Amino acid sequence: MDSFVSTYLWPALIMIGQSLLLLVCLLVFIAYILLADRKIWAAVQLRRGPNVVGPFGLFQSFADLLKFMVKEPIIPAGANKAVFLLAPLVSVVLALSTWAVVPVANGWVIANINVGILYILAISSLEVYGIIMGGWASNSKYPFLGALRSAAQMVSYEVSIGLVIVTVLLCVGSLNLTDIVMSQQTGLGTKLGLPASFLDWHWLSLFPMFIVFFISALAETNRPPFDLPEAESELVAGFMVEYGSAPYMMFMLGEYAAVVLMCSLTTILFLGGWLPPVDIWILSWVPGIIWFMLKACFVFFMFAMVKAFVPRYRYDQLMRLGWKVFLPLSLAMVVIVAFVLKLTGWA
């Protein structure tokens, strides 16, 4: 009995506790990321934004959560009830499950698997099914058109994201996310004789891929200017037209969880993860999770600024950018990076 407890039960309880702690912290972080998104957009438009619930509106997201939870869900008469209610659940569960392999500091990860980046690609590619299910089950033309747009958009830009990640993997030689971060302790800067700093991170040596990944992440998460699946001026609200109350909240939660995941992936792949910007003793005292969160928040700030300033693309422009610009550029960069690594032996 003691061996069973020590071998199976106790590790399982620890894993469950870690998962619950990560889930709570992630949901709170998403709540404030959502508030920051609204505040930034309001500031650009010279408005004050949410400022009533709590000091400076800090509890606005929790008030919205309570409002959504107490509302009655309305299911359209012609909808497939089971699939209609299952779709937002699928969306949010898949979006949250990818966080099991994301390291937020050295050793701070639930499952430090050797194929972590492959796991994230596999799970994130399934998230489109929640949108397709919601659009089809609504039995309405606008949700269905939004779901079709989302499927085409996510498939188009997943190819570019995959090729960008391949260029990073060529430089690192590992699919493990922790190894990808630690490999950025030395890079282009140190090879040129400079002290270890942010110049060693992949954003500089793979700058074109950094830009492609950032823009593709916007398209993958349906963020403006690529919010074609829920374009208000064209499709009213896209695949979420018929949703309200808790199901709508779950779709929104899944969307922002995917956005925060892409911000974290950008941090891990190109911005050194939890590494300090300069390797000096005073910055090394700062916990790695603080650096990770600051970098992820910076990437999200860029997401929010793009939302505020860049007008929405037309659908044909979106497809042209993905297939005629990003795909050839990503393929060319894979070949160029492989050639340079073979020639210089820097891998």
Swiss-Prot record:
Its EC number is 7.1.1.-. It is a multi-pass membrane protein. PROSITE patterns: COMPLEX1_ND1_2 (PS00668). It comes from the Bacteria. One of its GO terms (molecular function) is oxidoreductase activity, acting on NAD(P)H, quinone or similar compound as acceptor. It is found in: Cell inner membrane. It holds the Pfam family NADHdh. Signal peptide: none annotated. It catalyses: a quinone + NADH + 5 H(+)(in) = a quinol + NAD(+) + 4 H(+)(out). Keywords: Cell inner membrane, Cell membrane, Membrane, NAD, Quinone, Translocase, Transmembrane, Transmembrane helix, Ubiquinone. GO terms for biological process: aerobic respiration. Its main location: membrane. The chain crosses the membrane at residues 13-33, 82-102, 115-135, 161-181, 198-218, 258-278, 286-306, 321-341. One of its GO terms (cellular component) is plasma membrane. NDH-1 is composed of 14 different subunits. Subunits NuoA, H, J, K, L, M, N constitute the membrane sector of the complex. NDH-1 shuttles electrons from NADH, via FMN and iron-sulfur (Fe-S) centers, to quinones in the respiratory chain. The immediate electron acceptor for the enzyme in this species is believed to be ubiquinone. Couples the redox reaction to proton translocation (for every two electrons transferred, four hydrogen ions are translocated across the cytoplasmic membrane), and thus conserves the redox energy in a proton gradient. This subunit may bind ubiquinone. Belongs to the complex I subunit 1 family. This is NADH-quinone oxidoreductase subunit H.
